[in-house]
Amino acid sequence: MTQQEMITINAELRDVTKTKAIRSLRKKGNIPAVVYGKGHNNVNLTLSAKEFTKQYKLGFLSAHVIELDISGKKEYALVRDIQWHVVKDTIQHVDFQFVDKGSEIKIDIPLSFVNESKSPGIKLGGVLNVLCRSITVKCSPDKIPQAIEVDLSGKMIGQSVHISDVKLPGGVKLAAHEEENFTVVTISAADSGVEESQVETTEE
């Protein structure tokens, strides 16, 4: 499991807040933004629409801690909200949240299902019934993994992988469902996938 690559987004301080000025800013190819957080004052920013949209489409901004370069001053931040134009499908505004380097944060991490070729159940024609595609974890910004692996080795038809079976990277722990050993995925028979998943999710 590799840690996330740190993406840098360039931003400039913004002193305009009125609607007309914001509209003019967008026409020039920019996006208004704000960054906020506990212990910090709100800071109004301007982003390059081309640069930010490119990173968004590459999938580098969702559930990632990024480096905000604010007129030469670098800060850690999370993208918390993106507002879209209802007709043009262009980004209208971005909210960031400051992240302190030494703090522990909550973040959703995607699950990656590995070793399907080592699952006898899948070799026999079983299908994956994925019940959970991401989990919320706690970790410091420098420990955020790109994904968390779910090992399917040895799994037969009718068997499940529960959250207790998933090995978390060092420095990463569950943020939610800490007392609930919920089902992540089952190997279901191709002709009875629904029935198999219902049985497995009720098992303790």
UniProtKB/Swiss-Prot annotation:
<keyword id="KW-0689">Ribosomal protein</keyword>
<dbReference type="InterPro" id="IPR020057">
    <property type="entry name" value="Ribosomal_bL25_b-dom"/>
</dbReference>
<dbReference type="GO" id="GO:0008097">
    <property type="term" value="F:5S rRNA binding"/>
</dbReference>
<dbReference type="GO" id="GO:0003735">
    <property type="term" value="F:structural constituent of ribosome"/>
</dbReference>
<comment type="similarity">
    <text>Belongs to the bacterial ribosomal protein bL25 family. CTC subfamily.</text>
</comment>
<comment type="subunit">
    <text>Part of the 50S ribosomal subunit; part of the 5S rRNA/L5/L18/L25 subcomplex. Contacts the 5S rRNA. Binds to the 5S rRNA independently of L5 and L18.</text>
</comment>
<dbReference type="GO" id="GO:0006412">
    <property type="term" value="P:translation"/>
</dbReference>
<dbReference type="InterPro" id="IPR001021">
    <property type="entry name" value="Ribosomal_bL25_long"/>
</dbReference>
<dbReference type="Pfam" id="PF14693">
    <property type="entry name" value="Ribosomal_TL5_C"/>
</dbReference>
<dbReference type="InterPro" id="IPR020056">
    <property type="entry name" value="Rbsml_bL25/Gln-tRNA_synth_N"/>
</dbReference>
<dbReference type="GO" id="GO:0022625">
    <property type="term" value="C:cytosolic large ribosomal subunit"/>
</dbReference>
<dbReference type="InterPro" id="IPR029751">
    <property type="entry name" value="Ribosomal_L25_dom"/>
</dbReference>
<protein>
    <recommendedName>
        <fullName>Large ribosomal subunit protein bL25</fullName>
    </recommendedName>
</protein>
<comment type="function">
    <text>This is one of the proteins that binds to the 5S RNA in the ribosome where it forms part of the central protuberance.</text>
</comment>
<keyword id="KW-0699">rRNA-binding</keyword>
<dbReference type="InterPro" id="IPR020930">
    <property type="entry name" value="Ribosomal_uL5_bac-type"/>
</dbReference>
<dbReference type="InterPro" id="IPR011035">
    <property type="entry name" value="Ribosomal_bL25/Gln-tRNA_synth"/>
</dbReference>
<dbReference type="InterPro" id="IPR037121">
    <property type="entry name" value="Ribosomal_bL25_C"/>
</dbReference>
<dbReference type="Pfam" id="PF01386">
    <property type="entry name" value="Ribosomal_L25p"/>
</dbReference>
<keyword id="KW-0694">RNA-binding</keyword>
<keyword id="KW-0687">Ribonucleoprotein</keyword>
